[in-house]
């Protein structure tokens, strides 16, 4: 359990700090 929490945390920290995902992944804003 401890290892899973650590990995998740780490993963959350990496996502957060990391750069934003490509526009293709995220939802595209509408043209309006």
Curated annotation (Swiss-Prot):
Top-level taxonomic group: Eukaryota
Keyword Signal: no
GO MF terms held by the record: beta-N-acetylglucosaminylglycopeptide beta-1,4-galactosyltransferase activity; galactosyltransferase activity; lactose synthase activity; manganese ion binding; N-acetyllactosamine synthase activity; UDP-galactosyltransferase activity
Record field: catalytic activity: D-glucose + UDP-alpha-D-galactose = lactose + UDP + H(+); an N-acetyl-beta-D-glucosaminyl derivative + UDP-alpha-D-galactose = a beta-D-galactosyl-(1->4)-N-acetyl-beta-D-glucosaminyl derivative + UDP + H(+); N-acetyl-D-glucosamine + UDP-alpha-D-galactose = beta-D-galactosyl-(1->4)-N-acetyl-D-glucosamine + UDP + H(+); a beta-D-GlcNAc-(1->3)-beta-D-Gal-(1->4)-beta-D-Glc-(1<->1)-Cer(d18:1(4E)) + UDP-alpha-D-galactose = a neolactoside nLc4Cer(d18:1(4E)) + UDP + H(+)
Localization of this protein: Golgi apparatus, Golgi stack membrane; Secreted; Cell membrane; Cell projection, Filopodium
GO biological process terms on file: acute inflammatory response; angiogenesis involved in wound healing; binding of sperm to zona pellucida; cell adhesion; cell population proliferation; development of secondary sexual characteristics; epithelial cell development; epithelial cell proliferation
Enzyme Commission number(s) of this protein: 2.4.1.-, 2.4.1.38, 2.4.1.22, 2.4.1.90
Cofactor field: Mn(2+)
EC primary class: transferase
Protein topology in the membrane: Single-pass type II membrane protein
Keyword set includes Kinase: no
Entry coiled-coil feature ranges: none
Pathway: Protein modification; protein glycosylation
Posttranslational modification: The soluble form derives from the membrane form by proteolytic processing.
UniProt entry keywords in alphabetical sequence: Cell membrane, Cell projection, Glycosyltransferase, Golgi apparatus, Lipid metabolism, Manganese, Membrane, Metal-binding, Secreted, Transferase
GO cellular component: basolateral plasma membrane; brush border membrane; cell surface; desmosome; external side of plasma membrane; extracellular region; filopodium; Golgi apparatus
Protein purpose: This protein is responsible for the synthesis of complex-type N-linked oligosaccharides in many glycoproteins as well as the carbohydrate moieties of glycolipids.
Family, similarity comment: Belongs to the glycosyltransferase 7 family.
Identification of the protein by name: Beta-1,4-galactosyltransferase 1
Organism of provenance: Rattus norvegicus (Rat)
Gene symbol of the encoding locus: B4galt1
């Amino acid at each position: 359990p401890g290892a899973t929490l650590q990995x998740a945390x780490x993963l959350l920290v990496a996502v957060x700090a990391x750069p934003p995902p490509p526009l293709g992944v995220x939802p595209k804003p509408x043209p309006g």
